[in-house]
């Protein structure tokens, strides 16, 4: 069929043609957002899950919803190599300059001064261009947790003064170091205590709840950590059929069953298989034969890109561990079983 009309979009954080199976979480987020703007903030949301399940797509949807409600939004991908403080300051500068338009606001001017103080303590000794004076004694202690709390409190007050709010959408949150994570949690805790319209949504890998709990013991009371995983059979079928039906293309039932079985409802695989099967098919309906024709291309694409990129980053010990898991078959697996496969003690099995 016409490759130009192919509705499927495999990629990193690429919005799928049909965002299916996440309605409950999106609704929960929108309620939390509206409550925060109304001065009744509650728990912030941190979706967690493996790569390819759609966490970044959800963050982008949350971004869209916040904009629709006329909130200010900063979208950050946490850097692996540090520099989060500068990145946060740069994004908040843009927000405050937006809020500074129109009638003079004491709260906004104060927030700009506190941001100036915050940037004066950047690790490399540089600052971000702001045509205001720093406010002494605010966000200038050099203690990241206190300074970040001062800054987000001031920005929250500035947003409230403009009848707005702030959404911080933070992707790859597990890359924050312990000090950065503790500082951010501390800052959100303070804005909640002061009923300020500040909401944090942070997506990360499954280890994020443990990292957050280690950083601040009250993290589990401040955030919800919904698990984002594979889709059920009905939702997986909808991911395939909704965008194709919009183009007048159908699947045979056995083809749908085959694709749902092959992908196990894993969102990225649904997009990858859907993309290649569409290109392999000559006309509607898409059949089992089309899937068989597309299979080598899908396997090559996954092997050379999806899997290889991750495998290349593994240490030799991690590769051995991964190979042992693969030899055990579909998981999950207990650490004791993996240790037995590696012929080592449980306490020394983990890479």
Q: Can you say where each PLM-predicted feature lies in the sequence?
A:
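P-loop NTPase nucleotide-binding core
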Residues: 38-53, 57-168, 196-198
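Winged-helix-like regulatory helical subdomains adjacent to P-loop NTPase cores
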Residues: 265, 271-346
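Helix-loop-helix "sensor" segment of P-loop NTPases
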Residues: 36, 208-264, 276, 283-285
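Short amphipathic alpha-helical interaction segments
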Residues: 179, 342-351
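Conserved nucleotide-binding/hydrolysis micro-motifs of P-loop NTPases
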Residues: 46, 52, 79-83, 175, ...
């Amino acid at each position: 069929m016409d490759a130009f009309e192919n509705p499927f979009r495999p990629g990193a954080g690429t919005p799928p043609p049909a965002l299916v199976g996440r309605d409950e979480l999106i609704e929960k987020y929108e309620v939390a957002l509206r409550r925060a703007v109304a001065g009744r903030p509650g728990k912030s949301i941190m979706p967690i899950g493996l790569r390819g399940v759609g966490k970044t797509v959800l963050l982008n949807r949350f971004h869209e919803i916040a904009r629709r409600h006329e909130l200010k939004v900063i979208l950050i991908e946490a850097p692996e190599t540090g520099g989060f403080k500068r990145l946060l300051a740069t994004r908040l500068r843009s927000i405050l300059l937006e809020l500074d338009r129109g009638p003079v606001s004491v709260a906004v001017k104060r927030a700009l001064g506190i941001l100036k103080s915050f940037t004066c303590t950047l690790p490399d000794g540089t600052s971000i261009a702001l045509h205001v004076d720093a406010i002494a004694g605010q966000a200038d202690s050099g203690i990241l947790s206190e300074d970040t709390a001062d800054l987000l409190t001031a920005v929250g007050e500035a947003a409230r003064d403009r009848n707005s709010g702030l959404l911080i959408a933070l992707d790859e949150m597990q890359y924050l170091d312990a000090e950065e994570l503790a500082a951010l949690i501390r800052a959100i805790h303070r804005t909640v205590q002061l009923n300020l319209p500040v909401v944090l949504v942070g997506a990360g890998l499954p280890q994020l709840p443990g990292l957050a709990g280690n950083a601040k013991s009250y993290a589990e009371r401040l955030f919800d950590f919904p698990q984002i995983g594979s889709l059920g059979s009905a939702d997986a079928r909808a991911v395939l059929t909704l965008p194709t039906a919009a183009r007048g293309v159908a699947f045979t039932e056995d083809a749908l069953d085959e694709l749902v079985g092959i992908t196990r409802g894993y969102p990225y695989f649904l997009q990858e298989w859907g993309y290649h099967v569409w290109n392999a098919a000559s006309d509607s309906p898409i059949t089992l034969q089309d899937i068989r024709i597309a299979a080598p291309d899908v396997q090559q694409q996954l092997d050379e890109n999806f899997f290889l990129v991750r495998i290349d980053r593994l240490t030799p010990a991690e590769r051995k561990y991964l190979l042992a898991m693969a030899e055990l078959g579909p998981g999950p697996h207990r650490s004791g079983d993996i240790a037995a496969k590696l012929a080592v003690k449980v306490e020394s099995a983990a890479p």
